[in-house]
Structure formats: structure tokens, C-alpha cells
Amino acid sequence: MEDDEEETTASTLRGKPRPPPVSAQSAFSYIPPRRLDPKEHSYYYRPARTGIISLYDCIFKRRLDYDQKLHRDDREHAKSLGLHVNEEEQERPVGVLTSSVYGKRINQPIEPLNRDFGRANHVQADFYRKNDIPSLKEPGFGHIAPS
């Protein structure tokens, strides 16, 4: 009779937690704990590198040093410090960012560079620099006043 009884512990007394009611759940509420999709399905076109950090570590094991470059040092990625935006952008097959820095594909040019008329541009600039052109000295549009 004593062998049939289970050992009473705190976990057996608590029991299983009850799931929330159906009315509290959304159709889009399920988020998988870890995505194992190929890198082609991700926004950054690279496999996910997420670490598991417990809530205890987030609260009680904070870094105590001071970073003077951050506006507030409780923000982890303020001013994009610690992020690898340029590497992520270069790995994508199609650029997403439209800034002047990351939107240009220097290593993947759209068309090959054409330097055939470089000498013509150089001669034209040299001609306008050396010759006295009256239209540039007359008052009006494009007038250059000597100082």
C-alpha cells in the first residue's frame, strides 16, 4: 500500500499550467521557439545565430562597464553598435537598404565601367580652363566674378 503512493513534491502539487482560453489566443499567436528554415527564407539571407539568454541573466548579470559612445548604455544596439549591417547587406542577392553607403553594390556592378571617353572629358575640362570664354565672364547665368 505504501509502494503505490507517489512521492509528494512541489511539482506534483502544482500540476500542469493551464493554457489560456481560446478567446485569448490569436490565430497568429504561435511563434516557434527556433526557426530552422534555410537562409534563403530569412530577411538577412543568413542562418539565424540566436543565443539562449535566461531572464535571470538579463536582469541580474548586466555588464557594469560604461560605454561612452552610447546615448544610454542600457540599450544594447543603440546607434547600430555591435551590429554587422554592411556584412548582412553584402550577403543578400538583392540590396534592401537604399542609403548611399549600403545600397550601392560596388562588388556587383550593374554594368561594366566604360572608360572610353575619359580622355575626351579631360580635354574638354582643360579647354574650358585654359581658354578665355566670354559667356562665362558676362553677367548673367553662369557668371563667374573674379575675386
From Swiss-Prot:
Residues 1-36 are annotated as: Disordered. The keyword Cytoplasm applies. GO terms for biological process: flagellated sperm motility. Keywords: Cell projection, Cilium, Cytoplasm, Cytoskeleton, Flagellum. It is found in: Cytoplasm, Cytoskeleton, Cilium axoneme; Cytoplasm, Cytoskeleton, Flagellum axoneme. Its main location: cytoplasm. GO terms for cellular component: axonemal B tubule inner sheath; axoneme; ciliary basal body; sperm flagellum. Microtubule inner protein component of sperm flagellar doublet microtubules. Microtubule inner protein (MIP) part of the dynein-decorated doublet microtubules (DMTs) in cilia axoneme, which is required for motile cilia beating. This is Cilia- and flagella-associated protein 90. It comes from Homo sapiens (Human).
